[in-house]
């Protein structure tokens, strides 16, 4: 992505209504996965605030603050996606010289933030695959898991993933309806 001067560039003037000490940051979130993602921002109170849902390979321009952390979850399972191999993205202000003739004058630019799939072990990949398949194809996935002839540790991990996916579906569903 070529450098893009931020549209809301106010030449360093404070954003109207912004708290003192907050620095505005301009980002372009790009979903590089084949999954639909929920974007959340988190401020001082550590509460996840649903921002929007991003389809596969979709982008969105966001004006945020350095004090807002961002996280990204799979729309259906709640699995966390990553930015630069990290689960949480902390915005950083990017400024460049306005021109070569006046290198002292800096302007804000919008930085591209690539959201990607997390690195997982083969075991984790298989567990997620089985859990997602069971939720899509079965009315009683827990009963099926208990019937599998696999080690109890794998059963517990599958049950834990099912619980995680189901609880995320409930919580995210109420956030999306607001």
Swiss-Prot record:
Pfam families: VHL (PF01847). The keyword Transport does not apply. Pathway: Protein modification; protein ubiquitination. InterPro entries: VHL_beta_dom (IPR024053), VHL_beta_dom_sf (IPR037140), VHL_sf (IPR036208), VHL_tumour_suppress_b/a_dom (IPR022772). Belongs to the VHL family. Part of a complex with Cul2, Roc1a/Rbx1 and the elongin BC complex. Interacts with sima/Hif1a. Interacts with itself. Interacts with mgr and betaTub56D/tubulin beta-1 chain. Interacts with tubulin alpha-beta heterodimers by itself or in complex with mgr. Interacts with microtubules (MTs). This is Protein Vhl. It comes from Drosophila melanogaster. The gene is Vhl.
């Amino acid at each position: 992505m070529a450098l893009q001067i931020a549209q809301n560039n106010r030449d360093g003037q404070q954003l109207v209504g912004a708290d003192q000490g907050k620095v505005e940051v301009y980002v372009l979130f790009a979903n590089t996965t084949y999954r639909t993602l929920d974007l959340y921002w988190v401020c001082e109170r550590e509460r996840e605030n649903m921002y929007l849902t991003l389809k596969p390979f979709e982008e969105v321009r966001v004006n945020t603050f350095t004090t807002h952390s961002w996280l990204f979850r799979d729309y259906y399972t709640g699995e966390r996606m990553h930015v630069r191999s990290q689960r949480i993205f902390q915005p950083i202000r990017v400024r460049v010289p306005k021109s070569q003739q006046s290198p002292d004058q800096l302007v804000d630019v919008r930085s591209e933030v690539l959201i990607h799939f997390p690195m997982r072990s083969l075991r984790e990949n298989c567990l997620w695959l089985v859990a997602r398949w069971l939720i899509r194809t079965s009315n009683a996935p827990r009963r099926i898991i208990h019937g599998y002839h696999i080690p109890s540790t794998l059963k517990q991990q599958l049950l834990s993933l099912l619980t995680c996916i189901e609880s995320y579906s409930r919580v995210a569903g109420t956030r999306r309806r607001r």
